[in-house]
Structures are given as C-alpha cells and as structure tokens.
Amino acid sequence: MSRVAKAPVSIPASVEVKLDGQLLTVKGKNGELSRTIHNSVEVKQDNNQLTFSPRVGIANADAQSGTARALVNAMVIGVNEGFTKKLQLVGVGYRAQMKGNVLVLSLGFSHPIDHVLPAGVTAECPSQTEIVLKSADKQLIGQVAADIRAYRRPEPYKGKGVRYADEVVRMKEAKKK
C-alpha cells in the first residue's frame, strides 16, 4: 500500500463530502469540486475521515490509491481555504492589469496579450508588476499560472520575464571578450 494512501484525509466541519459510487463531491465555502476516483481505489467515509485503499489484484492500484488521496486532500483544502499563486513581471515596460475577467499583459511584444481567465480562477493586480491568482482547484490554478508564465519565461542573462514569486532564476554570465 502507498505511504501517502495510508494517512486518512480529515474533513473539517465546514466541508461537506458526498460519495456516489466512484464520484466524490466536496462542498465548502469556496465552492464545489468533484472528481471521479479510479476503479482500482476503494474509498470509505467514516464520520469526518476518508480512507483510501487499493483493490486487490489490480496492477497500479497502490499508486492510484496514493494519487487519489493526494487529489482529494487538495480538493478539501481548496474548498475550505483556497489556493493562491503569485507571479512577478520583471523587465522594463512589463505590466499587467485586469479588465473584467481578462488579464491584459504587456510583455515587450508589439501587441498586448489578453489572457481570459477560466471559471473558478480569479486574479488581482496589487501593482503593475504583480499578479495574484486565487482558486479552489489546485490543478486549475497551477495550469493558469503556467500558461501566463509561458508567454515570456525568465531569460537566464538578465532575468526578464514572468516568474513565480518564489522562483529562483539561475543567471548566466555574459560572454567575455
């Protein structure tokens, strides 16, 4: 059995979990998330805990049980507390601003980039060089942050580009004559 799957997922009082066959729905103050659990994983709900165990005789059942436990734990944390990702824009003239549900980025191209945020993700710009993303869905917020970063990755000579707030960009030395 997976080491991750051995630990049960504790459910806070403010979170409601509904298990319907292999479909697990988690409801909290930040919204509602649902996910289909793999057939090789058996889920049991006891009071305020969810336990995950692999079904016997199925290949990869151990790995799937650990994965399912980690995904459901992220869902419970997301609907209860939510997730945030911070991005920084480094470079002369690099700016970000919100216009409704659209994030407008000026990243040194000849045109501004309009990035439409998907449902479930909100963004705010405390300054022109900072973007703060908030969502209950950990996978979705990570994908949106990666998409925004992909427009202009940090380059290794000057460090210009879009980076995560906690990202350390390894700098190269310029060519010497």
Swiss-Prot record:
Keyword Cytoplasm found: no
Q: What protein name applies here? A: Large ribosomal subunit protein uL6
A single GO CC term for this protein reads: cytosolic large ribosomal subunit
What is annotated about its quaternary structure and interactions?
Part of the 50S ribosomal subunit.
Q: Which Gene3D superfamilies match?
A: Ribosomal protein L6, alpha-beta domain
Question: Which SUPFAM superfamilies does the record match to this protein?
Answer: Ribosomal protein L6
Biological process terms from the Gene Ontology for this record are: cytoplasmic translation
Taxonomic source organism: Histophilus somni (strain 129Pt) (Haemophilus somnus)
What HAMAP family does the database record attribute to this sequence?
Answer: Ribosomal_uL6_B
Q: Which family does it belong to?
A: Belongs to the universal ribosomal protein uL6 family.
Q: Gene name, please? A: rplF
Sorted keywords for this record are: Ribonucleoprotein, Ribosomal protein, RNA-binding, rRNA-binding
Function field: This protein binds to the 23S rRNA, and is important in its secondary structure. It is located near the subunit interface in the base of the L7/L12 stalk, and near the tRNA binding site of the peptidyltransferase center.
Domain of life, per UniProt, equals Bacteria
